[in-house]
UniProtKB/Swiss-Prot annotation:
Key words, A-Z: Ribonucleoprotein, Ribosomal protein, RNA-binding, rRNA-binding
Alphabetized InterPro entries for the sequence: Ribosomal_uL10 (IPR001790), Ribosomal_uL10-like_sf (IPR043141), Ribosomal_uL10_bac (IPR022973), Ribosomal_uL10_bac_type (IPR047865)
Source organism of this protein record: Helicobacter hepaticus (strain ATCC 51449 / 3B1)
UniProt entry tagged with the keyword Transferase: no
Protein name per its UniProtKB record: Large ribosomal subunit protein uL10
Gene (name only): rplJ
Record family assignment: Belongs to the universal ribosomal protein uL10 family.
Amino acid sequence: MTKQEKIQIVEYLSAEFKNASALIVCDYKGLRVNQLEELRCTSRSANIKVQVIKNTLANIAIKNAQCPNLELKDTNIFLWADDQIALSKVVCKFADSYNEHFSLKVGLFDKQVVDIKHIVSVSKLPSKEELIGMLLSVWTAPARYFVTGLDNLRKQKEEN
């Protein structure tokens, strides 16, 4: 890889990391190619970006994105997205499926370093769509009860 290619990769990653709401670093040592492709396909469908990056390039990109230093070692795969919950769910589900060869190392949520426990706890939260559904259910409940009451009143009057 030429120096110019490395510069382009670092610039691209710096912009991506700066715009991402969440970044998770995982160890993938021992994963087979088809398992890695499964992670990529699942991630792609959830608008999550996945890339294996050299640690030196990743450190430079993270520094350029004004994020805290992560002190990266060994083999790392980087996953990042705008939705922290969706990213956490995908990564934790995959880690549960392939726990012998895939493990979470560290994360950055809103440019703050988070540990594995935090990532797992975020993965247990309802998704954005589920939260919107819950909110709509709460908002429509009074109208639904009012209509049900009117319908019961109508049925009662028809019986009498």
